[in-house]
Amino acid sequence: MAKLVGSIIDKVTGESVETKVQVLTAGGKFIHPNNAILKIGPGSPFFYSNGNFEIDVPRGKTRLTIERGTEYIPQNINVDVPAHGVVDLDINIERWSVLADQGWHPGNTHIHYDENEHRPDERLQLDPRIEDLRMTAVSILKRWDLEYAS
C-alpha cells in the first residue's frame, strides 16, 4: 500500500481549510483515515478533514472529491497511486462567491445528529465550519421517547 498525504488550501488566502473529503479506490471502495470523523446516514460517504489527511491507499486509480460549503467550487481529483511510497497532494480549493459581501449569511436551522454516531459532539462542531455556515441550530430527537429539542 501507498500513503496518500493531502493538504487542502484556500487558493486565495493560502490558509489550510477544513473540508469534507471522499476517497474512492480503483474498485469504488470508500476509504478514510482510521481516526476520521465520518458522515453517518444515507448519501455519499465522506470524512471530515481539518485541512490535512493521511490515508493508506491500494495501488490504482483513486478518486478524491473535496467540498466546503456552497461558496467553494468542489474539486474532483484522480490520482494514479503506486503500489508503495508516498503521494503528496496539495489541493487548492477556490471560493467562487462571498455571500456575506452581498448581504447573505448562510445558515442551517435543522442539523441532526444520528444516534449511531460515535463522536457526535465533535462532528456537530465541525459541520458548521466545513459547510461555512454563520448560524446553526442542532435538533435532537430521542426516537423512542419522542422528546424533541433544539
Predicted feature locations:
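Short strand-edge motifs at loop-to-beta-strand transitions and within beta-strands
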Residues: G51-I55, I77, V87-L89
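Extracellular beta-sheet/turn segments enriched in Thr/Pro/Gly and aliphatic residues
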Residues: V79-L99
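A short, amphipathic beta-strand motif
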Residues: A2-K11, V21-V23, T62, I91
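A short, solvent-exposed beta-strand micro-motif common in secreted/extracellular proteins
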Residues: V21, P45, R59-G69, P128
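Catalytic cores of extracellular degradative/oxidative enzymes
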Residues: Q102-S150
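A short, solvent-exposed loop/turn motif at the edges and junctions
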Residues: N52, I66-I77
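Short, surface-exposed beta-strand/beta-hairpin micro-motifs centered on an aromatic residue
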Residues: G43-F46, N50-V57
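Short, ordered, surface-exposed loop/turn motifs in non-cytosolic proteins
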Residues: V12-I37
